[in-house]
Each structure stands twice: as structure tokens, then as C-alpha cells.
Amino acid sequence: MAKKEVAKIKLQIPAGAANPSPPVGPALGQHGLNIMGFCKEFNARTQDQKGMIIPVVITVYADRSFTFITKTPPASVLIMKAAKIEKGSGEPNRNKVGSLTMAQVEEIAKLKLPDLNAAGLESAIKSIAGTARSMGIDVK
């Protein structure tokens, strides 16, 4: 018989830097999970992606065990890293803060494709380009 699923917890944690402090501790603690066990396993799985924010979906079972799935970093984080900026524009229509080439956008789209709800690479590229434009980044 399959384990009974109690909850799904979605968090965004810096790769290789999960620790029991908020937001990880309280989110897992209220479901009675082993916080340090999760932190060690997450850090081991994401140590090669240091410096990135990694979304994780933790599935909690009735016997207080858990499994988790790591996803690709958010598109906005990948775009900011490619454009070498700290944050997007407060007024994206007026103030442009950086620029990306179509090759860079395509590379980000290929990386994000497994997690995107896109029909194919073309639509994924359009989605990433739209995200970049909404952050005040020119796509050339």
C-alpha cells in the first residue's frame, strides 16, 4: 500500500545553503519532519549549483517521512545572472537595466524547458523573452 500523502510544501532555498532557520525550519517543523535530515540531503543534492535559488517541492507523508523534488532555478534568477544585474527595473517600460541576446534567451529556455508549461522550445523562448522584458531587460 502506498504511503498516505499529508502535505506538499513549496520553498525556494539557496542551493547548498539550507539551514533550520526560517523559512525552512518553521515550514518543516509544523509537519513534524526531521529538519536537519532535509537540510543535509538538500545541500548534498544542490552543492554543484551554489549561488542559485532552487525551488523545491517537499511531499510529507502520514508517517512523518518525506520526499522532495528540486526544480530548475526561477527564470528571473537565470535572466539576472545572464544580464549581470542585481535586480530588475522598477519601471520596465521606461528604464532598461540591461540587455540579453537571443542566444542567451535560448540557452535559458533550454535549461528551463523541463519545468515550463510550454509546447516546445519556440514557445519557451517567447516566455523567457517576455519575462526579461517585464524586468526591464532588452532582448536583441
Swiss-Prot record:
Post-translational modifications: One or more lysine residues are methylated.
A Pfam match: Ribosomal_L11
Entry-linked Gene3D superfamilies: Ribosomal protein L11, C-terminal domain (1.10.10.250), Ribosomal protein L11/L12, N-terminal domain (3.30.1550.10)
Disulfide bonds: none
Keywords linked to the UniProt accession: Methylation, Ribonucleoprotein, Ribosomal protein, RNA-binding, rRNA-binding
A single BP term in Gene Ontology: translation
Entry's Gene Ontology molecular function annotations: large ribosomal subunit rRNA binding; structural constituent of ribosome
SMART domains: RL11
A GO-annotated cellular component: cytosolic large ribosomal subunit
Keyword Nucleus: no
InterPro entries: Ribosomal_uL11 (IPR000911), Ribosomal_uL11_bac-typ (IPR006519), Ribosomal_uL11_C (IPR020783), Ribosomal_uL11_C_sf (IPR036769), Ribosomal_uL11_N (IPR020784), Ribosomal_uL11_N_sf (IPR036796)
PANTHER family, per the entry: 60S RIBOSOMAL PROTEIN L12 (PTHR11661), LARGE RIBOSOMAL SUBUNIT PROTEIN UL11M (PTHR11661:SF1)
Similarity field: Belongs to the universal ribosomal protein uL11 family.
Biological role stated in the UniProt entry: Forms part of the ribosomal stalk which helps the ribosome interact with GTP-bound translation factors.
Quaternary structure and partners: Part of the ribosomal stalk of the 50S ribosomal subunit. Interacts with L10 and the large rRNA to form the base of the stalk. L10 forms an elongated spine to which L12 dimers bind in a sequential fashion forming a multimeric L10(L12)X complex.
Protein name in UniProt: Large ribosomal subunit protein uL11
Source species of the chain: Desulfovibrio desulfuricans (strain ATCC 27774 / DSM 6949 / MB)
